[in-house]
Amino acid sequence: MTVNDNSKQEILNFHYKKNFLYKDLYKNPCNEIAINLIESWPKWPVDNRITCIYGPSGSGKSHIANIWKEKVDAVIYEGISHLTLGHIYSIKRPLIFENLISNHKWPEELLFEFFNEIKSSNNYLLITCNDNPLKFRWKLKDLISRISSFTNIEIKLPDDELIKKILVKQFSDRQLSLDKQFIEYISQRIERSYLAINNVVDII
């Protein structure tokens, strides 16, 4: 580690800001399908108006969504509980719905109207959520049918290479620089999950 104990304490007590720079987006077999889709814009299939990227917390969904936001000048919403059809009708730019959670009770008829408006207006929508949206406990059959037409892309659990890159990035976000041996040591001993990576970084 290249910081002493005192400076480390000061940094950890300071509110750090996550960055969503393209250069810090690490393509890997775990996430390359999602990243390839974002990189291929605007050469998306005509019928690919709504895309959902899903995976566990910390898997980089927000990073990918924010890269696309900058690329297409999209409007991003954290959840949709406060939205109305008026919002959708009035916005002519691509949309992002962030962090749809599987155990939340969503207004299904309103969602169905949202999705129909996106398609009929030839707009684009990117959704991020914690699980495959087809596994949500939807009741409205028309909504289920509509969701089944989405491009649904999973971000898988990290492999060893991605774990090390995420560790380096998260420490860097906190203005900490650790040597390669220490990163290697951590990566070989933690659970293969994004949550475990976040927990280790928070502890250190």
Question: PLM features: residue spans?
Answer:
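Short regulatory helix/loop adjacent to the ATP-binding pocket of P-loop NTPases
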Residues: 133-148
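Conserved P-loop NTPase "ATPase switch" module shared by AAA+ and STAND
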Residues: 88-108, 114, 121-130
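A short, basic N-terminal segment
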Residues: 1-40, 44-46
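The conserved phosphate-sensing helix
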Residues: 190-202
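Walker A/P-loop nucleotide-binding motif
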Residues: 47-64
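Conserved AAA+ ATPase "SRH/arginine-finger" region at the nucleotide-binding site
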Residues: 150-162
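Short conserved motifs of the RecA-like P-loop NTPase core
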Residues: 177-189
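Conserved AAA+ ATPase "sensor/coupling" helix adjacent to the nucleotide-binding pocket
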Residues: 161-177
